[in-house]
Amino acid sequence: MHCNADYHPLFSINFQYLTKTMVEEACCDPVVLRLLCIHLCDLPGADFVLHCHCGDASRLECQASRVALKLLMGSMRPVLRTPLPWTNCCTNVAHYCVGSVGILSVWRFSRSVTEDLLRELVDFAKVDLAKKTVYQFNCSDCGTLRWLLLSLHKTVNLPDKVGFHLGQYDVGLWKNVDTCQLNSGHSCMLRFINVNNEEYQERFLKSFTFRNKRCLE
């Protein structure tokens, strides 16, 4: 469930989370904005679906809001304002920006450390979902944003030894907005081995063992 109150779906969107603030920023007409925001909650778009709390999807008011929102969606494009310090298939953090609104999504168990970092750097608002917490903040300052993402990578990803790839990978695929929802935290979990006070990927060390064995044969 996205909200505790009753709601009905409007249409699919092309990114995972859309906040009411994004709608307010994208809409230039105050009359249209007032109409749109009557029945929108703080997080009207979740899991790629936009929803409404008006109670009757057949009402003219709801139909008009649906059309206006579809037009607004044409101007909303999720982007990365700074390179990600992680790969999307094996991170506990998801991030992108729409306009000046930055989005962070983390698992509920990472909420405390995430909020500690956010409080130090930016003002933020949050919405708690069943398994994740979604944060929004102003992402206009790229320097602050870069430091925030790097800090989250160190405190949320690295303690669990995730966020690493071995060998070559497609940067365009694993570090872009389209794959940010793949942050399951499980698909690329790698075990590390401590050797001479340095940590190495277990499969990296095993690859040398296998190659040396073949050479001896």
UniProtKB/Swiss-Prot annotation:
Q: What is this protein called?
A: Protein E4.3
